[in-house]
């Protein structure tokens, strides 16, 4: 079975309860490794009045060298250690504060995530599954990252792409956790062309649509203008480049050379993988719109995620593309209001994320 490294997220959230309640079923389709120290796990289990059997847990430690070892088997738990350069001393000796934003919990969740990420990178597991963190807790812990995807870009020095959804609808985000006022400045021919090229090469979706940035997709330049001035040109260029089968070196050169761009367009015949014009966003998510195209790219976060979650909240997942590791996540937050209350929780997104990671690795 495939091995999944699972980071604990924010220990004050519903993440640990999702993990424990799902463990038996999850273990039927993969071998999970949970990145949490035994002492902290026991505190959480006591608060939840739950038990965890036949599980593998990984205690992580800051060290200059990478080392993975089996430590012991105790109370039906297999305990391992993973040493690596984390940049912070690991402190697992703090109290769980259910539903509260806490810097210690934030830092611990980050280190669990970083350790699990490199565990996969070092080939000890096949994919990474992350449970939800709280961005304010990360900020209070002095961390510079706005979330998992932002951190993964820094870890691996790659331009990670965030994609969310399910088999009925997937959406790639051109921009993520940035203020809306900054999005238009980010939309350049170069930035968008690189994104569209990378998004296709990571997914190989056969038909994709780019959602308009402005209302009515700009109405032929009447509103805004990004669609006609930038987006249509980037779509045409990327479609022509992908059709040409030319290499990355040529792509980088053509980005700066209008003559090469014209040459590509002249030689391009037929349909591209991207629809030629930006789609009007307010109709793209209707039944008719999704029947036409259900693999989309959005210029900003809420343009895609508001309708996605309205339609498929229970089973949507988060996938990080364009990285040296496979990373998936649940598509929901910390749900502090439900944490440690034995409330009814939906684990469908968690299972869908795990299954997606397993299938993706099998196809690799």
Curated annotation (Swiss-Prot):
GO cellular component, as recorded: cytoplasm
Primary location group: cytoplasm
Pfam families assigned to the protein according to its UniProt record, in alphabetical order: PdxA
Binding site for a divalent metal cation: 177, 216, 301
Sequence positions that bind substrate: 148-149, 309, 318, 327
GO biological process: pyridoxal phosphate biosynthetic process; pyridoxine biosynthetic process
Keyword Oxidoreductase belongs to the record: yes
Subcellular location: Cytoplasm
NAD among keywords: yes
Miscellaneous notes: The active site is located at the dimer interface.
Description of how the protein assembles with itself and partners: Homodimer.
Protein function: Catalyzes the NAD(P)-dependent oxidation of 4-(phosphooxy)-L-threonine (HTP) into 2-amino-3-oxo-4-(phosphooxy)butyric acid which spontaneously decarboxylates to form 3-amino-2-oxopropyl phosphate (AHAP).
Official protein name in the record: 4-hydroxythreonine-4-phosphate dehydrogenase
Gene that encodes it: pdxA
């Amino acid at each position: 079975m495939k091995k999944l490294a699972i980071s604990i997220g924010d220990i004050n959230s519903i993440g640990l309860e999702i993990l424990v309640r799902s463990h038996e079923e999850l273990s039927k389709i993969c071998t999970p490794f949970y990145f949490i120290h035994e002492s902290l796990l026991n505190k959480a289990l006591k608060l939840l009045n739950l038990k965890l059997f036949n599980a593998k847990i990984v205690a992580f430690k800051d060290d200059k060298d990478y080392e993975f070892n089996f430590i012991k088997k105790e109370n039906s738990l297999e305990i391992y250690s993973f040493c690596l350069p984390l940049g912070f001393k690991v402190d697992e000796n703090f109290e769980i504060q259910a539903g509260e934003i806490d810097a210690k919990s934030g830092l611990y969740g980050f280190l669990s995530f970083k350790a699990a990420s490199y565990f996969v990178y070092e080939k000890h597991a096949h994919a990474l599954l992350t449970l939800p963190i709280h961005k304010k807790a990360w900020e209070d812990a002095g961390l510079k990252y706005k979330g998992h995807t932002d951190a993964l870009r820094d870890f691996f020095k790659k331009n990670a792409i965030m994609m969310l959804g399910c088999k009925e609808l997937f959406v790639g985000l051109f921009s993520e956790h940035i203020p809306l006022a900054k999005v238009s400045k980010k939309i350049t021919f170069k930035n968008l062309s690189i994104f569209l090229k990378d998004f296709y090469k990571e997914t190989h979706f056969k038909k994709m649509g780019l959602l308009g940035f402005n209302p009515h997709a700009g109405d032929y330049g009447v509103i805004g203008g990004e669609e006609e001035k930038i987006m249509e040109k980037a779509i045409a260029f990327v479609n022509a480049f992908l059709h040409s089968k030319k290499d990355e070196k040529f792509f980088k050169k053509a980005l700066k050379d209008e003559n090469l761009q014209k040459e590509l367009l002249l030689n391009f015949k037929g349909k591209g993988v991207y629809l030629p014009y930006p789609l009007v966003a307010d109709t793209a998510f209707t039944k008719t719109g999704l029947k036409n195209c259900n693999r989309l790219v959005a210029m900003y976060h809420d343009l895609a995620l508001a309708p996605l979650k309205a339609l498929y909240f229970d089973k949507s997942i988060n996938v990080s593309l364009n990285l040296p590791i496979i990373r998936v996540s649940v598509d929901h937050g910390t749900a502090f209001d439900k944490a440690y209350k034995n409330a009814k929780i939906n684990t469908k997104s968690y299972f869908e994320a795990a299954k997606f990671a397993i299938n993706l690795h099998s196809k690799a």
